[in-house]
């Protein structure tokens, strides 16, 4: 599995924030860009690249929707970021991941 530069950028930023993402996590037939596991809660983090998603067809859109739906059925939350979000708003992306952790901790209390 090829890792994009923007996946590396987001990974480093999430790690720098004190979180422990698992890169290239496999679940069923899917390879997640990252996974965060917090107790019994699981977050799939995906970086949607410009090249891959530049010319969305109905097939690509449907495939990602089915993937998200299956992950949710398996008990995962899904957070997707576009490359431009990682590039232009990196700290906001990290904050969204941290908010997920904080919200899930609150839910568990």
Locations of regions flagged by a protein language model:
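Nucleic-acid endo/exonuclease domains
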Residues: 1-109
